[in-house]
Amino acid sequence: MKAMILAAGKGTRVRPITHTIPKPMIPILQKPVMEFLLELLRQHGFDQIMVNVSHLAEEIESYFRDGQRFGVQIAYSFEGNIVDGDLVGKALGSAGGLKKIQEFNPFFDDTFVVLCGDALIDLDLTTAVKLHREKGAIATIITKTVPQELVSSYGVVVTDDNGKILTFQEKPAVEEALSTEINTGIYIFEPEVIDYIPSGQEYDLGGDLFPKLVDSGLPFYAVNMDFEWVDIGKVPDYWQAIRGVLSREIKNVQIPGIEVRPGVYTGINVAANWDNIEIEGPVYIGGMTRIEDGVKIIGPSMIGPSCLICQGAVVDNSVIFEYSRLGPGARLVDKLVFGRYCVDKTGAAIDVQAAALDWLITDARHAAVQYRQEYPSQREISKLLQPE
């Protein structure tokens, strides 16, 4: 069976992470989100998978290649051009990407599934396809019910009593929402649906194609299913995903490594004298990381591989990516550290290098950074990283 993973977006709402990592490659405890999707697809018999790529396409292609080591076949559709010797992505939209593939050569010749490349799911795809076919649908959206107070964060789907889609509401105010069913970005299509997508232009599934299907009166349905769905569309979403995995609220992701203390998991060759470290799980620490004496770590927290957490530092409810160095005495509370950026839970970021705060946070591969006199502006910024 055939499927498509949408992986061409720039991921602007997950910046600064997506400056160097495309959204499908964002790691959940060192494993890219898209790898979980491939495992799910393979489990349900989808072994021919098309992936549209654009932003940082080479990162996705070089990791997954032709899919052999994941037990599937993968091919890529690049959206963009070479301009002045540089590869420049230009995404065609979620529907435009489908059209490009089908016009190249009719790949989709039977019922197929489309997944967004930035979500963790454990959906029973076999049952979903069965329900789609039973309804005689040309297109089906998998929906999920959320509490009324959360509908304003999602695209709301409004249906009749038989599940046929009547209209959509994009992030409506709570009091204006006509439904609590939301679009999860999981779709089941018949090949004929691609005939409704125009050629050679940017075209979106939700904003363009779906309203056209409704207006045309086509058999377009929503199927509401109960499953685990963790969207990673924004920095706060990613934060919650990591917390959910560490706290075992997300059941379909296992914590890797070995448990060295209750609730404390590590990769191989972590250098730490646990008797001289105050640590409270759940915590994951990647391999080849050094934790110096006097460090305090409070979970849920994740420290990536090849990091250095210096003496007296505090890591509290935080996520630290690989090759990060947290300086002596630094206090990191409710923060995400990615390269030269320190990000809070709302997504607001500080460029620690531009702020000359590399004595506090830097790349662990640099030579040791010495403490130096701070300027007032630096002191004010550092307070954001070291809340009381």
From Swiss-Prot:
Pfam family, one: NTP_transferase
CDD domains in the record: NTP_transferase
UniProt GO cellular component terms: cytoplasm
The enzyme's E.C. designation: 2.7.7.9
Cofactors that this protein relies on: Mg(2+)
Catalytic activity of the protein: alpha-D-glucose 1-phosphate + UTP + H(+) = UDP-alpha-D-glucose + diphosphate
Residue stretches spanning the membrane: none
Keywords from the named record: Magnesium, Metal-binding, Nucleotidyltransferase, Transferase
Disruption phenotype: Complete disruption of this gene could not be achieved, suggesting that the CugP-type UDP-Glc PPase is essential for growth and survival of Synechocystis.
Keyword Glycoprotein: no
Gene3D superfamilies per the UniProt record, alphabetical: Hexapeptide repeat proteins, Spore Coat Polysaccharide Biosynthesis Protein SpsA, Chain A
Binding site for Mg(2+): 118
Recorded superkingdom: Bacteria
Keyword Nucleus among UniProt keywords: no
GO terms, molecular function: magnesium ion binding; nucleotidyltransferase activity; UTP binding; UTP:glucose-1-phosphate uridylyltransferase activity
Biological process, per Gene Ontology: biosynthetic process; UDP-alpha-D-glucose metabolic process
Misc. comment: The CugP-type UDP-Glc PPase appears to be present in all cyanobacteria, whereas the GalU-type UDP-Glc PPase is present in only certain cyanobacterial species. Moreover, the GalU-type PPase is found to be widely distributed throughout the bacterial kingdom, whereas the CugP-type can be found in only very limited species other than cyanobacteria.
HAMAP family reported in the protein's UniProt record: CugP_cyano
Family, similarity comment: Belongs to the CugP-type UDP-glucose pyrophosphorylase family.
Role, per record: Catalyzes the formation of UDP-glucose, from UTP and glucose 1-phosphate. Is highly specific since it cannot use other NTPs such as dTTP, CTP, ATP, and GTP, and other sugar-1P such as GlcNAc-1P, Gal-1P, and Man-1P, as substrates. Has probably a central and essential role as the substrate supplier for galactolipid synthesis; galactolipids are major constituents of the photosynthetic thylakoid membrane and important for photosynthetic activity.
Protein name according to UniProt: UTP--glucose-1-phosphate uridylyltransferase
Lineage, broadest ranks: Bacteria, Bacillati, Cyanobacteriota, Cyanophyceae, Synechococcales
Name of the gene encoding the protein in the UniProt record: cugP
